[in-house]
Amino acid sequence: MTSDEKSATRDIYDPNTLPDYDREFIDPDDLRQFEKALNAPEAAPLVALNDWRPVNQRVRKSRRTKPRRSKDETREGVLYTVLKWPFLFTVFAWITVLGFAYTLTRLYIFLYEQFVTWRGKRERLRKELSMQTNYQDWLKAAQALDTYLGNLKWKETDEYAYYDHLTINKVVAQLKQTRKAAETEMQNGRSGLSDPPAVEELCFLLEACVKNNFAGVENPRLYSETYSGTKDLVQEYIDEVHSCIRLVLDSKQISNEDKYQFFKHLDTNFGRTALCLSGGATFAYYHFGVIRALLDNDVLPEIITGTSGGALVAALVATRTDEELKQLLVPALAHRIRACHEGFTTWVRRWWRTGARFDTLDWARQCSWFCRGSTTFREAYERTGRILNVSCVPSDPHSPTILANYLTSPDCVIWSAVLASAAVPGILNPVVLMTKKRDGTLAPYSFGHKWKDGSLRTDIPIKALNLHFNVNFTIVSQVNPHINLFFFNSRGSVGRPVTHRKGRGWRGGFLGSAIEQYIKLDMNKWLRVLRHLELLPRPLGQDWSEIWLQKFSGTITIWPKSIPSDFYHILSDPSPERLARMLHVGKQSAFPKIQFIKNRLKIENAIMQGLQQCSSGGGRVMSPILSRRRQDRAEEHADRMVERLDQSFPERQSDYKDESHYTEVSDSLSATSSRPHTPDARRSSMFEEMRRQSAVFFDDSDMYADEDAVTT
């Protein structure tokens, strides 16, 4: 190791190199207001019995204790009372047996992969892959492993059952020909003024094919057969669409207004990408490595959501610029993580007295550094351009959850939302959200109601993100320990193909995968039965079945690999050495997904750039959906965060009347293709069509997702 490398290594462990390391952002007055809100009595309506009796008359305390549940809630009957506990114990016993069988099945699959498939040169290449610390070196090692396993031939072949390669072939050919015609017109001028310009035909083509998961090109299975990249045809489609969008943006034959309407249409159809960070106590520090990998490769989405421990990481990311994050996401950051610094006797006495292990005010003080003091969601967006979302659950079990962001709660203080999202019963008592008033002082938010851990109901708020920000592509970093134990992709995951049969087999063989799926689904079934029959106990007034039955995955799911010692340190601060390992593991788990994310953001960023350049107001431009929602809220708030875009959202208008020429071009190109595997004639045979449809497979990863698990 050279002297420069040794110096760089020392720097990443030196806390003095961290920006704002010694700075305390929190204002003591803010903490006092927060303490006052926490100690405020619960609001209770006072209603007199009648006009002559007092409101609070003295009555003797009844000796009869109030039942835990009312009959109206549980619909008690004779059979319910008699069969409840025997049925509950029987189901729990069966789930225990299934859990033991599941452990044996996973052990068999692990031994099968370790001692049957990973041997010889394949094992050596895999070890080299796991030792890489940056993406470029990792990519070279992944390509070497793909070459050895013969995966390059799979990339060169167009046919695959999980996407429509025939449609993609035709679209690529049409885009290429129309783009070349548009480039010729831009250089030499139009030859015939009666015909519409080629760039308009290109816009029609793009409006037809720039959609979320068009023809299956964003199916994760397309990236699950190799360690790097995807089908050559899919990559060609992504590159061609990007080139065509750039040509439309640079064209002088279309006005800025028409371009803006065009990009609004594309943005609505294509949607947005969001990064979702799960909870998981100190397991959430693996998110730092995931963030660092995405940041170093310029694929960090603007929309970020976090829950519980993931909310702390998301708050750090949303309140810092890229340059600040690159300096912060190093092992020295462990010196600022001091949430669990108290001794055993201190927290035991507190837990016995208050029912919570940690002190809320101390956590508020520690958390404020990660959130840059009492920064609000609106202020964080104005500073970095990132949209922070934090999932919070009300302490009242009958109230809906909230996804706090700069649209739903713009003046809410971030550190209060992070504390609320991390308030697990028994660990931290429910807290009050705080809002910043115009004079800069803090006050209780939402009438002083208290909130708790968002993971209890909505660890990954996919539906709320789609509602507020048109998100339809989610990157989930999942570190919940109780979920990681049951994570298993029988056909491989993005950048992690199956270890044998050149990635086309089943993990542990078909029988091993079938047994694993059956046992896991059976356990899930019995938990749902207990929940729907209202048989599950509710410790601390919480339905704990949601921590198992909600959806925890996304379009891309990143699963950092934990080790047994992480469970021992689940409620303790990391040392710089342990955080360094978690950073490395987090980056390693994100490297296989980067090419998929790059392809997605390549088109999305081009669309956003078009909105940016073609907008009349300039400045930061949001997507049309965000713009429309922001305009609605601007009528209620005098302080505007960005310049208002036009509130109308019309369909794209074009002066192009005669579409016969475009139809002729489309029909002519449908019969030909530059790719070798496209049939020369139009499919007209019924038997040929039936054969083609029978060869199409669908990704069933979301088939068993609970539709009611994620609320807004």
UniProtKB/Swiss-Prot annotation:
Molecular functions per Gene Ontology: triacylglycerol lipase activity
Q: What is its EC number?
A: 3.1.1.-
Q: Which cysteines are joined by disulfide bonds?
A: none
Annotated PNPLA domain ranges read 275-466
Which residues are the active-site ones? Answer: S308, D453
User: What this chain does, per the record?
Assistant: Probable lipid hydrolase.
User: What's the protein name?
Assistant: Patatin-like phospholipase domain-containing protein NFIA_019760
